[in-house]
Protein backbone atom coordinates (compact mmCIF):
# COMPACT_ATOMS: atom_id res chain seq x y z
CA UNK A 1 0.00 0.00 0.00
CA UNK A 2 1.51 3.33 -1.03
CA UNK A 3 1.10 6.72 0.53
CA UNK A 4 -1.32 7.55 -2.26
CA UNK A 5 -3.89 5.68 -0.19
CA UNK A 6 -4.09 8.71 2.06
CA UNK A 7 -5.66 12.07 1.35
CA UNK A 8 -2.92 14.02 3.06
CA UNK A 9 -3.74 17.29 4.70
CA UNK A 10 -1.26 20.18 4.64
CA UNK A 11 -0.75 21.55 8.11
CA UNK A 12 0.37 25.08 7.35
CA UNK A 13 -0.97 26.46 10.60
CA UNK A 14 -0.50 30.10 11.49
CA UNK A 15 -2.40 29.87 14.80
CA UNK A 16 -3.98 33.31 14.75
CA UNK A 17 -7.44 34.21 15.95
CA UNK A 18 -8.47 36.46 13.04
CA UNK A 19 -8.01 35.40 9.43
CA UNK A 20 -6.88 37.78 6.73
CA UNK A 21 -8.97 37.26 3.58
CA UNK A 22 -12.41 37.18 5.16
CA UNK A 23 -12.05 37.77 8.88
CA UNK A 24 -13.04 34.95 11.19
CA UNK A 25 -12.75 36.29 14.72
CA UNK A 26 -13.52 34.19 17.75
CA UNK A 27 -15.56 35.36 20.70
CA UNK A 28 -15.32 33.55 24.00
CA UNK A 29 -18.76 32.82 25.40
CA UNK A 30 -20.23 31.15 28.42
CA UNK A 31 -20.96 27.43 28.26
CA UNK A 32 -24.12 26.98 26.13
CA UNK A 33 -24.41 23.34 27.22
CA UNK A 34 -24.30 23.88 30.98
CA UNK A 35 -27.74 22.29 31.43
CA UNK A 36 -26.39 18.97 30.14
CA UNK A 37 -24.84 16.86 32.90
CA UNK A 38 -21.84 15.87 30.79
CA UNK A 39 -20.84 19.49 30.26
CA UNK A 40 -22.08 21.09 33.47
CA UNK A 41 -18.58 21.68 34.88
CA UNK A 42 -17.29 23.59 31.86
CA UNK A 43 -17.30 27.39 31.94
CA UNK A 44 -16.19 28.94 28.64
CA UNK A 45 -16.68 28.13 24.99
CA UNK A 46 -15.87 28.97 21.37
CA UNK A 47 -17.85 27.99 18.26
CA UNK A 48 -15.46 27.33 15.35
CA UNK A 49 -16.99 27.92 11.92
CA UNK A 50 -20.38 26.71 13.07
CA UNK A 51 -19.38 23.04 13.15
CA UNK A 52 -16.73 22.49 15.83
CA UNK A 53 -17.21 23.24 19.53
CA UNK A 54 -14.41 23.95 22.01
CA UNK A 55 -15.31 23.82 25.72
CA UNK A 56 -12.94 24.61 28.58
CA UNK A 57 -13.31 24.27 32.29
CA UNK A 58 -12.41 26.92 34.85
CA UNK A 59 -8.65 27.33 35.16
CA UNK A 60 -7.96 27.02 31.43
CA UNK A 61 -6.77 30.40 30.16
CA UNK A 62 -8.48 32.32 27.39
CA UNK A 63 -5.24 32.22 25.40
CA UNK A 64 -5.24 28.42 25.41
CA UNK A 65 -8.91 28.26 24.46
CA UNK A 66 -8.27 30.66 21.57
CA UNK A 67 -5.24 28.63 20.50
CA UNK A 68 -7.27 25.42 20.25
CA UNK A 69 -10.00 27.21 18.30
CA UNK A 70 -7.44 28.72 15.92
CA UNK A 71 -5.87 25.33 15.23
CA UNK A 72 -9.29 23.84 14.46
CA UNK A 73 -10.09 26.74 12.12
CA UNK A 74 -6.79 26.39 10.25
CA UNK A 75 -7.28 22.67 9.75
CA UNK A 76 -10.84 23.14 8.50
CA UNK A 77 -10.34 26.35 6.48
CA UNK A 78 -6.88 26.28 4.98
CA UNK A 79 -7.55 28.91 2.33
CA UNK A 80 -8.75 31.21 5.13
CA UNK A 81 -11.89 32.43 3.37
CA UNK A 82 -14.06 31.94 6.44
CA UNK A 83 -15.66 28.73 5.10
CA UNK A 84 -14.89 25.09 5.83
CA UNK A 85 -12.99 23.80 2.78
CA UNK A 86 -14.97 20.54 2.51
CA UNK A 87 -18.75 21.07 2.89
CA UNK A 88 -19.27 17.36 3.50
CA UNK A 89 -16.86 17.43 6.43
CA UNK A 90 -18.58 20.55 7.74
CA UNK A 91 -21.95 18.78 7.66
CA UNK A 92 -20.59 15.66 9.35
CA UNK A 93 -18.95 17.66 12.14
CA UNK A 94 -22.08 19.71 12.67
CA UNK A 95 -24.40 16.68 12.63
CA UNK A 96 -22.06 14.72 14.88
CA UNK A 97 -21.64 17.67 17.25
CA UNK A 98 -17.86 17.55 17.11
CA UNK A 99 -16.46 18.87 20.36
CA UNK A 100 -13.03 19.30 21.92
CA UNK A 101 -13.09 19.41 25.74
CA UNK A 102 -10.18 21.18 27.46
CA UNK A 103 -9.70 19.81 30.97
CA UNK A 104 -7.72 21.32 33.81
CA UNK A 105 -6.08 18.04 34.78
CA UNK A 106 -6.73 14.31 34.81
CA UNK A 107 -9.42 13.47 37.33
CA UNK A 108 -10.90 16.97 37.45
CA UNK A 109 -14.58 17.41 38.26
CA UNK A 110 -15.26 18.26 34.62
CA UNK A 111 -13.53 15.09 33.42
CA UNK A 112 -15.39 12.90 35.90
CA UNK A 113 -18.76 14.34 34.92
CA UNK A 114 -17.94 14.15 31.20
CA UNK A 115 -16.84 10.52 31.31
CA UNK A 116 -19.80 9.49 33.48
CA UNK A 117 -22.53 11.26 31.54
CA UNK A 118 -21.53 11.72 27.90
CA UNK A 119 -23.18 9.29 25.46
CA UNK A 120 -22.68 11.05 22.12
CA UNK A 121 -20.24 10.42 19.29
CA UNK A 122 -18.75 13.88 18.74
CA UNK A 123 -15.86 13.61 21.21
CA UNK A 124 -12.92 11.59 19.92
CA UNK A 125 -10.15 13.14 22.05
CA UNK A 126 -9.59 15.50 24.95
CA UNK A 127 -6.91 18.06 25.75
CA UNK A 128 -5.47 18.77 29.18
CA UNK A 129 -4.28 22.19 30.29
CA UNK A 130 -0.66 21.09 30.51
CA UNK A 131 -0.73 19.74 26.93
CA UNK A 132 -1.38 23.16 25.39
CA UNK A 133 1.34 25.73 24.73
CA UNK A 134 0.37 28.54 22.35
CA UNK A 135 4.01 29.64 22.26
CA UNK A 136 5.15 26.29 20.80
CA UNK A 137 2.34 25.27 18.43
CA UNK A 138 2.58 21.62 17.44
CA UNK A 139 5.95 21.16 19.17
CA UNK A 140 6.35 17.53 20.19
CA UNK A 141 6.09 17.15 23.95
CA UNK A 142 4.88 20.72 24.48
CA UNK A 143 1.68 21.23 22.49
CA UNK A 144 -0.66 18.38 21.55
CA UNK A 145 -3.34 20.63 20.10
CA UNK A 146 -2.85 19.80 16.42
CA UNK A 147 -2.84 16.07 17.12
CA UNK A 148 -5.95 15.96 19.31
CA UNK A 149 -7.99 18.37 17.17
CA UNK A 150 -7.04 16.40 14.06
CA UNK A 151 -8.10 13.15 15.75
CA UNK A 152 -11.53 14.66 16.30
CA UNK A 153 -11.90 15.98 12.75
CA UNK A 154 -10.74 12.65 11.31
CA UNK A 155 -12.96 10.52 13.56
CA UNK A 156 -16.16 12.56 13.43
CA UNK A 157 -15.58 13.86 9.90
CA UNK A 158 -13.39 11.90 7.48
CA UNK A 159 -14.21 8.41 8.78
CA UNK A 160 -17.92 9.13 8.34
CA UNK A 161 -17.81 11.02 5.02
CA UNK A 162 -15.20 8.89 3.24
CA UNK A 163 -15.56 5.39 4.74
CA UNK A 164 -13.91 3.58 1.82
CA UNK A 165 -10.75 5.54 2.52
CA UNK A 166 -10.90 6.25 6.26
CA UNK A 167 -13.26 3.86 8.05
CA UNK A 168 -11.62 2.71 11.28
CA UNK A 169 -12.96 -0.84 11.64
CA UNK A 170 -10.87 -3.87 10.59
CA UNK A 171 -11.05 -4.79 6.88
CA UNK A 172 -13.13 -1.71 6.11
CA UNK A 173 -10.97 0.81 4.26
CA UNK A 174 -7.73 1.77 2.59
CA UNK A 175 -6.65 3.08 5.97
CA UNK A 176 -7.23 -0.17 7.85
CA UNK A 177 -5.58 -2.15 5.04
CA UNK A 178 -2.54 0.12 5.07
CA UNK A 179 -2.26 -0.04 8.86
CA UNK A 180 -2.35 -3.84 8.87
CA UNK A 181 0.57 -3.83 6.45
CA UNK A 182 2.43 -1.28 8.55
CA UNK A 183 1.93 -3.32 11.74
CA UNK A 184 2.95 -6.57 10.09
CA UNK A 185 -0.50 -8.09 10.57
CA UNK A 186 -3.98 -7.40 11.88
CA UNK A 187 -4.00 -7.01 15.66
CA UNK A 188 -7.14 -6.13 17.62
CA UNK A 189 -4.96 -5.02 20.52
CA UNK A 190 -1.28 -4.29 21.08
CA UNK A 191 0.74 -7.50 20.56
CA UNK A 192 3.47 -8.59 22.96
CA UNK A 193 5.91 -7.90 20.14
CA UNK A 194 5.45 -6.58 16.63
CA UNK A 195 6.73 -8.65 13.68
CA UNK A 196 10.17 -7.74 12.39
CA UNK A 197 8.72 -6.37 9.15
CA UNK A 198 6.40 -3.93 10.96
CA UNK A 199 7.21 -0.22 10.83
CA UNK A 200 4.26 1.07 12.88
CA UNK A 201 4.83 0.07 16.50
CA UNK A 202 2.28 2.08 18.47
CA UNK A 203 2.30 0.52 21.93
CA UNK A 204 -0.38 2.19 24.08
CA UNK A 205 -2.11 -0.76 25.75
CA UNK A 206 -5.31 1.27 26.24
CA UNK A 207 -5.65 1.80 22.47
CA UNK A 208 -7.99 -0.56 20.58
CA UNK A 209 -8.01 -1.17 16.82
CA UNK A 210 -9.98 1.95 15.93
CA UNK A 211 -7.78 4.04 18.19
CA UNK A 212 -4.71 2.60 16.47
CA UNK A 213 -6.18 3.51 13.08
CA UNK A 214 -6.76 7.11 14.14
CA UNK A 215 -3.19 7.33 15.42
CA UNK A 216 -1.87 5.77 12.21
CA UNK A 217 -3.79 8.31 10.13
CA UNK A 218 -2.27 11.11 12.21
CA UNK A 219 1.26 9.83 11.64
CA UNK A 220 0.50 9.40 7.94
CA UNK A 221 -0.56 13.03 7.74
Where are these predicted regions, by residue range?
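Metalloprotease/metallohydrolase-associated module, dominated by Zn2+-dependent proteases
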Residues: 173-221
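A general structural signal for short secondary-structure junctions and capping/turn motifs
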Residues: 45, 89-94, 207-211
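Bacterial Sec-dependent N-terminal signal peptides
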Residues: 1-21
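N-terminal low-complexity, Pro/Thr/Ser-rich intrinsically disordered segments
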Residues: 21-46
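Acidic/His-rich structured neighborhood in mature extracellular/periplasmic domains
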Residues: 49-189
Amino acid sequence: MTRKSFALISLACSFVTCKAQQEVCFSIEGNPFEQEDAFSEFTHYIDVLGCFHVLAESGVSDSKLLHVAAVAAELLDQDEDGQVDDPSIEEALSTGQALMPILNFEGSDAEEMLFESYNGSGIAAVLYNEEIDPEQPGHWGADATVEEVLHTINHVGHAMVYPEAFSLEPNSSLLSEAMDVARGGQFMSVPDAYPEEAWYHYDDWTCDYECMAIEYLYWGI
